[in-house]
């Protein structure tokens, strides 16, 4: 992909020339050959990290008055040892076409280096300058809502050749300028990249080429996607319609997959450029974000995180969450587990998280510490706040930073000072925490897209991530460590318990692989609407749930919306907890044992939840949307049967515990109190040391946690 992007770029650079003249332009040809060689022989390499990074995003460009030296001193007092700069300021770096001004970058690099603070440089390509749009208005993406207007960030078409020409140029200019600066430790590719819904004529043309390459003939496309319906059949490639108006959910899902591929290619293209310049001791990362619901909630629908992360040396994420009485730590844990899983259970960077944020996010005393160390407990090697100082103008004025608008020390800044001190002091014990999970959640962007098109029905807001989070949160509350895998993962078979929510769209090969997982001794939990359609979101012509019925020992052909339906079975739950909603499948068991039937005068003969012994393993199937209490019970049962219920499961939310092995080979246990009530528990492990206090801890010692408090205990 790097090679293809390089060739495309140079073709664009030389498009005014004939082919003969192109090869006469020796300097361009040499550059092309050089980059092709670099693309072929340079790969992502995980960086060696020797200390915890504690940082902020810093914008000298936004400052209302001169205070750089004072900021550096306040950062040093706070224990800040890294800043990220430049990712939002293309119009400052290149105020006019081809005119570059590195004043702010140089000022910050010099000041930070003098202060002993490292710098991550972001490529400034997610917010385009005015002169570019004036010169090339077609850079603004056309979406199903029409052409974007200038003003907002992320309003451009990332596949536009003119945009990529300028992006390539500004990245190279910055890299040439900063690559040898000793303060620079790494580079961030773009910022929270997505396709931004780009779907204009040039994107549609690229999609047609993609479809030609993948499906070869229109007959194949018409058959696979069912385009005879409503006279959608395409009989000539020239007649291929825009996807903006399609009513075919299968074709829409394919276009969504193509748009995600644009993101993967775009990030790989930027990473390849940076890799030409960066030093061996510098890394490449990116700040992936998540489905946004006023905070970081679920799997990002618009990016294939695992695919896009392949071009990076280390994964990075932005994690924002509720605070005060709504702080649970679940979003910190979820985002961290996804990030750690992106690069095969490798440590990651939290590139953005909140210090204060919106008014409702101002943390209670103790919560900032709880949050920072919760990131480390999931495997983070860096925690970086956005931003350092609250901004005085424009869209994010009240997305407050570590400093408020007056730039003065405040309770959050004072608490951050204690974090910085502890990060520096405990870095040898806490950095590079290695985590091992026996439970994983299989997520699928293809299933997410398919379910978006063919979900629960009109007017139902419950989506893919709602169901996934119900299972994840259940594991989190029970202190069960969890990884994430996707269909491309080679490690699926390494787990003892695999949770597969809403696998609506999947190829036969994946479903057969999941059956083998069970047959070979794994315990799988499938949910409703799994196995329903193939990878092209075409509903299978067999009994549902398709191929997995073999391992699950069930089948069904009817489903409906539950009205006043509960579960009937030995669940040990209250009547309210046994209520179901939104969706129910009318399941007939073949070899499966029924765990719960529907409690209903008509549907009562059908199974709702089943369990089947298949080969050496167990397949649980949940045919309806249940309460969290039911989900938790099923999860706990699976974990116990897999032999994974241990000391940590004697504790539950609001006491959250996480553990891992540090670089000294010692096990570290984190204990967090996510509540405003004092609580206590009995420490179950052998002689240890509490790292924050330095106190010794012996087995069966009573540990007290104050509100929003924590302990970090290293086993001797």
Predicted segment positions?
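The substrate-binding groove and active-site-proximal loops of carbohydrate-active enzymes
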Residues: 54-63, 88-103, 149-166, 193-197, ...
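N-terminal carbohydrate-binding accessory modules
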Residues: 43-82, 95, 110-111, 429
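Short, acidic/polar
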Residues: 62-77, 296-308, 364-372, 487
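Aromatic-lined substrate-binding rim segments of carbohydrate-active enzymes
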Residues: 69-76, 84-148, 270-278
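Bacterial N-terminal signal peptides
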Residues: 31-39
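Polysaccharide-binding and catalytic clefts of secreted carbohydrate-active enzymes
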Residues: 148-325, 329-332
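Aromatic- and acidic-residue-enriched carbohydrate-binding clefts of CAZyme catalytic domains
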Residues: 49-53, 86, 93-98, 103, ...
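Carbohydrate-binding surfaces of carbohydrate-active enzymes
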Residues: 280, 309-716
């Amino acid at each position: 992909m790097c090679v293809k992007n390089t060739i495309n770029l140079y073709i664009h650079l030389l498009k005014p020339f004939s082919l003969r003249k192109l090869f006469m332009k020796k300097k361009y040809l040499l550059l092309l050959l050089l980059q092709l060689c670099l693309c072929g022989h340079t790969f992502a390499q995980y960086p060696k990290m020797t200390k915890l990074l504690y940082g902020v995003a810093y914008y000298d460009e936004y400052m209302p008055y001169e205070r750089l030296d004072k900021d550096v001193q306040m950062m040093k007092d706070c224990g800040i040892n890294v800043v990220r700069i430049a990712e939002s300021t293309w119009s400052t770096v290149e105020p006019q076409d081809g005119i570059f001004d590195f004043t702010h970058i140089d000022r910050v690099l010099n000041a930070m280096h003098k202060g002993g603070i490292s710098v991550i440089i972001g490529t400034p390509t997610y917010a385009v300058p005015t002169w570019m749009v004036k010169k090339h208005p077609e850079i603004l993406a056309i979406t199903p809502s029409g052409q974007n207007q200038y003003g907002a960030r992320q309003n451009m078409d990332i596949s536009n050749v003119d945009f990529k020409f300028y992006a390539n140029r500004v990245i190279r200019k910055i890299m040439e300028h900063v690559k040898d600066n000793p303060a620079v430790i790494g580079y961030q590719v773009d910022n929270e990249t997505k396709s931004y819904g780009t779907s204009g004529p040039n994107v549609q043309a690229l999609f047609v080429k993609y479809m030609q390459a993948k499906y070869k003939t229109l007959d194949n496309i018409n058959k696979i996607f069912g385009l005879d319906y409503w006279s959608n059949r395409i009989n000539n490639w020239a007649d291929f319609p825009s996807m903006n108006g399609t009513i075919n959910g299968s074709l829409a899902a394919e276009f969504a997959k193509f748009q995600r591929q644009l993101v993967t290619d775009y990030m790989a293209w930027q990473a390849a450029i940076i890799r030409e310049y960066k030093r061996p001791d510098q890394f490449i990362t990116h700040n992936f974000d998540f489905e946004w619901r006023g905070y970081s909630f679920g799997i990002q629908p618009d990016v294939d995180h695992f695919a896009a992360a392949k071009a990076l040396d280390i994964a990075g994420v932005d994690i924002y969450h509720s605070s005060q009485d709504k702080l649970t730590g679940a979003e910190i844990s979820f985002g961290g587990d996804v990030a750690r899983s992106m690069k095969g259970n490798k440590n990651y960077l939290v590139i953005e998280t909140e210090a204060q944020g919106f008014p409702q996010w101002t943390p209670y005393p103790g919560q900032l510490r709880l949050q920072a160390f919760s990131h480390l407990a999931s495997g983070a090697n860096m925690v970086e706040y956005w931003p350092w100082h609250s901004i005085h103008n424009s869209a994010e004025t009240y997305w407050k930073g570590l400093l408020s608008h007056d730039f003065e020390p405040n309770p959050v800044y004072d608490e951050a000072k204690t974090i910085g001190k502890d990060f520096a002091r405990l870095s040898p014990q806490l950095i590079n925490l290695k985590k091992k999970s026996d439970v994983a959640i299989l997520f699928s962007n293809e299933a997410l897209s398919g379910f978006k098109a063919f979900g629960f029905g009109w007017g139902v807001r419950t989506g893919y991530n709602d169901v996934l989070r119900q299972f994840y949160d259940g594991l989190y509350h029970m202190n069960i460590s969890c990884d994430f895998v996707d269909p491309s993962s080679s490690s699926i078979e390494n787990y003892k318990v695999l949770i597969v929510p809403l696998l609506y769209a999947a190829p036969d090969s994946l479903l057969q692989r999941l059956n083998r997982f069970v047959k070979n001794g794994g315990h799988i939990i499938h949910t409703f609407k799994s196995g329903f359609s193939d990878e092209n979101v075409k509903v299978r012509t067999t009994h549902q749930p398709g191929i997995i019925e073999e391992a699950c020992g069930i089948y069904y052909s009817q489903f409906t919306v539950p009205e006043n339906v509960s579960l009937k079975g030995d669940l040990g739950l209250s009547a309210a907890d046994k209520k179901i909603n939104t969706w129910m499948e009318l399941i007939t068991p073949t070899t499966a044992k029924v765990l719960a039937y529907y409690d209903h005068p008509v549907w009562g003969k059908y199974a709702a939840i089943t369990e089947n012994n298949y080969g050496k393993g167990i397949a649980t199937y949940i045919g309806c949307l249940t309460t969290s209490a039911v989900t938790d019970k099923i999860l706990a049962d699976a974990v116990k049967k897999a032999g994974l219920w241990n000391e940590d499961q004697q504790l539950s939310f609001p006491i959250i515990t996480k553990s891992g092995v540090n670089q000294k080979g010692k096990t570290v246990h984190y204990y967090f109190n996510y509540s405003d009530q004092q609580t206590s528990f009995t420490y179950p492990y052998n002689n240890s040391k509490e790292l924050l206090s330095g106190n010794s801890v012996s087995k069966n010692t009573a540990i007290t946690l104050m509100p929003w408090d924590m302990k970090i205990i290293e086993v001797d």
